């Protein structure tokens, strides 16, 4: 579910020249303690990994929903990704590699249903951790090399973020 002006705000970011855009994913439901915990985690991550990263001149994170991309760029990069889970993590690094900074639009709101049961949260987080560590092993070495050779802090930063549990 998106706010009525979501597409307009994403469109404005495209008009400004951004090729990869992340909207503000926020919580649709607060029905249980687990959905509340998930919502709090989401907003902390939005503040640090979207708004904060952008403030520092680096790319926002991708959340897996509420995203927009220049079509040809997205088509090209997705053809190189074979991931079933965690595609957004690999896509982040491929976007940065192609010099497409991920822009965050805090006012473009997309609502996400949060988990409400502990067993669902455990399974979800286990999948996320597994995919993050898979991509960390795959991309952290190149992140270090790119930092040393090219002073590519954005790519290095993303590769290091994969070590942070979701």
Regions found by a protein language model. Name each.
Residues 85-91:
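Acidic donor-binding loop at a coil-to-helix junction in glycosyltransferase catalytic cores
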Residues 5, 72, 90, 109:
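Active-site phosphate/pyrophosphate-handling residues
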Residues 9-83:
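Long helical/loop segments within the catalytic core of UDP-sugar-dependent glycosyltransferases
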Residues 95-96:
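Hydrophobic residues within well-ordered alpha-helices
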Residues 56-57, 116-166:
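Basic/Trp-rich segment in TM-proximal cytosolic loops or flexible interdomain/linker regions
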Residues 1-9:
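Membrane-embedded segments
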